[in-house]
Amino acid sequence: MIMESLVLNLQSKNQISDYIAEHHLMHYEAAILNEFIAAIDNNDLAQLQLLNSFGDCFRAITMNLHAYRKGLEFGFTKIAFDQPGWFKRPAFLDTEDLQFGDTSRYGNHSTITLGRGINHTWTYALHYSFGCAGGGYGLSVYGKQFKSRESALTFALNDLKAMMTVKVGSSDTTNDKQPIILATLRDIETAIIGLYQLTLF
């Protein structure tokens, strides 16, 4: 699909307004496009040029600028793009993988990955397995934000625990393997107890 070409200048207001009217936009997309219009109304060519530097079409600019701003919430300030022109995801610091369940076989355990931004804002990724069924997501600037490793881990453990608890006693014996689910829950409880004990010192 050919994306709409965008030439940002002080005469672009109608082009931007038409795009807003013709598309079902995410909240952040509409907000960014309204920034374009505000810059035009203020004759702020420098701001238009800055916005234009994030891509060569409406969609690329809004997505790239949104990604950059989400990264700022973690202290990532570098602006860089890959070859197709999409914003490069930043690398989180102090990442660690914590596994829960039967780690002797692939697919029999779940993994929580912790990481922090430059400003020490933490987040987590989660890959979960019920046996044959599962899912997950990686570390991202779109993830939930926490002020410490401990708070991120506590939230992630409770998140994973809730997922596993729902599957206890499931009649779907093909996808939801009870030994794997119960082993994962045991490891989660051990980790939660360990975190609690750390708060006593």
Where would I find each of the regions flagged by the language model?
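Short, flexible loop/turn motifs enriched in small residues
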Residues: G117-W122
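Short amphipathic beta-strand and strand-loop transition segments with alternating hydrophobic
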Residues: H109-R116
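A short, exposed loop/beta-hairpin motif centered on an aromatic-Gly-Thr core
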Residues: Y128-M163
